[in-house]
Amino acid sequence: MGKKGKVGKSRRDKFYHLAKETGYRSRSAFKLIQLNRRFQFLQKARALLDLCAAPGGWLQVAAKFMPVSSLIVGVDLVPIKPLPNVVTLQEDITTERCRQALRKELKTWKVDVVLNDGAPNVGASWVHDAYSQAHLTLMALRLACDFLARGGCFITKVFRSRDYQPLLWIFQQLFHRVQATKPQASRHESAEIFVVCQGFLAPDKVDAKFFDPKFAFKEVEVQAKTVTELVTKKKPKAEGYAEGDLTLYHRTSVTDFLRAANPVDFLSKASEISIDDEELAQHPATTEDIRVCCQDIKVLGRKELRSLLNWRTKLRRYVAKKLKEQAKALDISLSSEEEEEGDEEEAVAETKQAPEEEEEREEEQLNRTLAEMKAQEVAELKRKKKKLLREQRKQRERVELKMDLPGVSIADEGETGMFSLRTIRGQQLLEEVTQGDMNAADTFLSDLPRDDIYVSDAEDDDDTSLESDLDPEELAGVRTHSDLKEQKYLRFTQVDDNKEEEGENPLLVPLEEKAVLQEEQASLWFSKDGFSGIEDDADEALEISQAQLLYKSRQKEQQPTDPPPPPTNLKTEKKSPQGQNEVPKETEAILGTEAVTDPGGEERGNSSDSDSSSSEDEDSWKVSRGVKRGRGSKADEDGFEVVPIQDPVKYRILDPEGLALGAVIASSKKAKRDLIDNSFNRYAFNEEEGELPEWFAQEEKQHRIRQLPVDKKEVEHYRKRWREINARPIKKVAEAKARKKRRVLKKLEQTKKKAEAVVNTVDISEREKVAQLRSLYKKAGLGKEKRQVTYVVAKKGVGRKVRRPAGVKGHFKVVDSRMKKDQRAQQRKEQKKKHKRK
């Protein structure tokens, strides 16, 4: 009994599988792709109407190849699944209701392309099916004439039948160019062909008979021709021999054969070639075979005739070479007088042509140089354009991968970046930054007299108020102290700039000074139990060292110095930092009174034995230390006032309960007051951290805690938000996944191109194509996914055959601990072998 084959298996060809892979809804999508590849009508279209569009394969192709903002409308009897940027209608194209729906959707628009891939329900009889298809095409043409713009395209499917020629004639009346084609995706056994009508004429009025199937497909009776009509009345002219040619045998010479313009025609008419020239007869190319062939040409075959043509070519070369040698000999035999006359004429001509040739040569050289420069400029422009396009492509890829925001690039750093303190290295760069653009100020000051020193009104008021408040002695002390400061600054500014060492950045202040860090480390070290006995001795040594430092600093302050004259250089004033000139008035007064001596010559600092003087000294030392600490050690070196760094605010990361409590506090003032009132309870203690044992504090925190008045739903909401935040991948992981996805997509596109090339190849069989496609997808890693294997640990005492455990689906593998140990041992052996080879 014969085996029955599958009915629809032969229909699953390469385009069926390609449609499955590329995501098209039907294999007919490739028909439209191939038609568009040939006629290029989708790229220029702004509006498209697809009749009989289900299931939507042609709509997918149109949405892919047309501009993004195009209008695409699809109509069919059956519903079409929605597509992005596509409008679908469920109507019958043969009814007036469909025309009204299209007018409502298109409004005043005219479409550029009308597609029709419709076919009736076939199966009754071939004649009936062909007529139904032609009638459907005529109705589609009627809709196309209503909505198609001038110069538009109409692509329709037609069956090859007796109604095909009338349809073609109607198309030719309405369109400028009509072409019938059958794309490669259309099956060979199918009777369908596609007619592409381009250049719609858009007549003002179309005869309704064109769209009437009774008139369009009416059979025209052809009158039969009689026998007398078939017989031609004029007798044709008799063709005989050439005039004067009475014989069939023609003998020609080899010279005529060499001079013939068409040697093939000459051989077809000649019967014999006689070699009458002795020199040509003795030529090495004239062999015995050639002589025999020349005796009877009519009996020669293709090979012998080709040898005669080659023989003719060799003889012609020989004769041409001989004629050149004879002409050369004739030129040499000219008389000497003629040669001399010729030389004189040539010399005169050369003298005339020399400047002209030189000018032409220079002009040619100049043109060549200009052309080279222009080519270099064009190449440079191309290189810059390519670089710009490459950067734009990279930026676009980064934006698509969400590595950058649109318009903001983290990777691209221009020449002018943001200001950074880390770029300032050394005092010179710092002065350039602080000075800024002072050209306008220098110009203004240069126009004024040199002797004037300008002080603002506010400074004048401060000075007058200070002079009125202080006694003469205190005022003298303040002036002496300010003179000392100015003299110290002048000595510092006179240091050579070349001796500056580029140290650390003066604007970057560390969180803690080195001395403070060293002191903290030392205190941690000496807080150990081994140093507990020598604590008193260390305190005494520290007090002695502090007293010595205090005494030395007071002696330096009490030394009288002659005040130098105040500086009048405007440039120095401009460079002087604000932190040194502006010292608090109270501090200057205190320091000044400490440094001034009595009129009798006795210093105030000598009475150190009394308690009052010692206390005053300590207070003044504290004030001076406070001033120095406020100005910092860098104030004298760099000319900037260093402000003490405040501790940054420590942000706490709140748990869900804390967030819910914060929401309650932020939403209601009354709830906030209630929370503050409830915080004073019996569970609240005022112990500082570290007073109680750690185990006791943890136990109290666990068991003696008051429940917060927050909603469970609110806490669960914030807990869910935390889970979502924690579930997000970090930026590097997201970028890596995006890069991996981009590589896979790129590899997939390359594989698709190769697969299309393999599919379009005609020389190989279908089996070889399938094998090549399978190997391509396997190399690209796009084959079948590895099936999931469930590992089941075997128990002792179970045989080789193990039943499927409960709850395990799919493929499973039985493993045991012995197998795992064996595999590890095998891996260790392989590792040892590798080390030995190295």
Curated annotation (Swiss-Prot):
| Protein origin, superkingdom | Eukaryota
Chain sites annotated for binding S-adenosyl-L-methionine: 56, 58, 76, 92, 117
Where are the Citrulline modifications? 390, 774
Known EC number(s)? 2.1.1.-
Q: Tell me one GO biological process term.
A: RNA methylation
Question: What general EC class does the enzyme of this chain belong to?
Answer: transferase
Residues joined by cross-link Glycyl lysine isopeptide (Lys-Gly) (interchain with G-Cter in SUMO2): 571, 634, 650, 669, 701
Q: Which reaction does it catalyse?
A: a ribonucleotide in rRNA + S-adenosyl-L-methionine = a 2'-O-methylribonucleotide in rRNA + S-adenosyl-L-homocysteine + H(+)
What is one cellular component GO term in this UniProt entry? nucleoplasm
Per UniProt, the ranges with Basic residues bias are 802-812
Q: Where is the composition biased (Basic and acidic residues)?
A: 813-829
Point out residues bearing the modification Phosphoserine. Answer: 333, 335-336, 532, 545, 576, 667, 679
Here the segments flagged for biased composition (Acidic residues) are 336-348, 457-474
Record region (Disordered): 332-367, 453-482, 537-639, 802-838
Signal peptide span? none
- Pfam families in UniProt: DUF3381 (PF11861), FtsJ (PF01728), Spb1_C (PF07780)
Q: After translation, how is this protein modified? A: Citrullinated by PADI4.
Q: Which residues form a coiled coil?
A: 730-768
A Gene Ontology molecular-function term? rRNA methyltransferase activity
UniProt keyword annotations, A-Z: Citrullination, Coiled coil, Isopeptide bond, Methyltransferase, Nucleus, Phosphoprotein, Ribosome biogenesis, rRNA processing, S-adenosyl-L-methionine, Transferase, Ubl conjugation
HAMAP family per the UniProt record, alphabetical: RNA_methyltr_E, RNA_methyltr_E_SPB1
Q: Which family does it belong to?
A: Belongs to the class I-like SAM-binding methyltransferase superfamily. RNA methyltransferase RlmE family. SPB1 subfamily.
Q: How does it assemble?
A: Interacts with NIP7.
Q: What does this protein do?
A: RNA 2'-O-methyltransferase involved in the processing of the 34S pre-rRNA to 18S rRNA and in 40S ribosomal subunit formation.
Would you tell me the protein name for this molecule?
pre-rRNA 2'-O-ribose RNA methyltransferase FTSJ3
Organism, scientific name: Mus musculus
The lineage is: Eukaryota, Metazoa, Chordata, Craniata, Vertebrata
UniProt lists the gene as: Ftsj3
